[in-house]
Amino acid sequence: MPSFDVVSELDKHEVTNAVDNAIKELDRRYDLKGKGTFEFKELTVTLTAEADFQLEAMIEILKLALVKRKIDAKCLEIKDAYASGKLMKQEVILREGIDKELAKKIVAHIKEAKLKVQAAIQGEQVRVTGKKRDDLQEAIAALRAYDSGMPLQFNNFRD
C-alpha cells in the first residue's frame, strides 16, 4: 500500500548558516552596529539589544536570513522581550517536530477532506496510507492548503 510521512524538520546546518548571516547583516547595518547580538544554542536564538525597536529589527533580519536559506519562518516561536540590566533580551525558539496536538489536527483535517486515505500518528510524524498514489497526492495537496502554523514536509513516499 502506498504511503508517505508528514514531518516538520529543520536542517540544523542551514539554521546555523542563517544565524551567521544574520550576525553579519547586523554588523553591516549602520543603525544597529555594535548595539545588538545574536546567540545561538540548540535551536534557541537569544537576541540582545539596547531598545525594543532594535529587537524588532533584529527579528526581521533573522527571518530574512532564514527565508534566504529556505527555512520557513512559521517554525519561529518568538517569546516576549524582557529587561536584563540596561539591555533588552528576547528569545526566539526554532520549533521542530509535530507535537501530539498538531498531529491530531492534521489527522482530523485529512478525515474532514473525506479522502480515501488513513492517517496514523507515529511519534513526531504522521503516516498517511492509501490504496492509490493519486489519493496520496490529493492528501498532500489538502495538507499544503491547510495552515497548520508549522512548516510541513512530506517524505518517505512509498509505492
From Swiss-Prot:
Q: Keyword Nucleotide-binding on this protein?
A: yes
Record carries keyword Aminoacyl-tRNA synthetase? no
Question: Record's Pfam families?
Answer: DUF520 (PF04461)
Q: Which domain of life is it from?
A: Bacteria
GO terms for CC?
cytosol
Matching entries from Gene3D superfamilies are given as:
3.30.70.860, YajQ-like, domain 2
Q: Name one GO molecular function term.
A: nucleotide binding
What SUPFAM superfamilies does the record tag this protein with? YajQ-like
Q: Which UniProt keywords apply?
A: Nucleotide-binding
Family recorded in the similarity comment? Belongs to the YajQ family.
Physiological role? Nucleotide-binding protein.
Q: Give the protein name, as stated in the record.
A: Nucleotide-binding protein Psyr_4087
> Which source organism?
Pseudomonas syringae pv. syringae (strain B728a)
Give the lineage: Bacteria, Pseudomonadati, Pseudomonadota, Gammaproteobacteria, Pseudomonadales
